[in-house]
Amino acid sequence: MGQDYTPTWSFLTNHAQVLICIAHDPGVRLREIGETVGITERAAHRIVGELAAAGYIWRRRNGRRNHYTIQSHLPLPDPLAREQKIGDLLAILAGEQRSETER
């Protein structure tokens, strides 16, 4: 593996990448999420639905658009990182600043 090697895989799941998109823009459109993550709009819709069903995001209609709120106080669903919170991950990956009440 030389310096020109570009992996075809990612450390971050599509779910994590969708959360990062929402953290950057809570009013982001599913089409924009798909374009940014490199998935179809339908896949973005499915992932947002899964995140909402699991309680990691709240979806609220705002006119013709959705507005998302990330529940940053919830633990990560991964067995090796259950002591960490969603907000901890986003603070690192999305540069999110959290208030003391979210910690």
Identify the role of each PLM range.
Residues D4-H15, R29, R61-Q84:
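Short, cationic-aromatic polyanion-contact patches
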Residues V48-G49:
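Short, hydrophobic-biased segments on the C-terminal half of alpha helices
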Residues M1-Q3, P75-R103:
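Amphipathic alpha-helical dimerization/coiled-coil segments
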Residues R42:
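Key DNA-contact positions within bacterial/archaeal DNA-binding proteins
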Residues E35, A52-A53:
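Alpha-helical residues within the helix-turn-helix
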Residues A16-C21:
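Pre-recognition alpha-helix immediately N-terminal to the DNA-recognition helix
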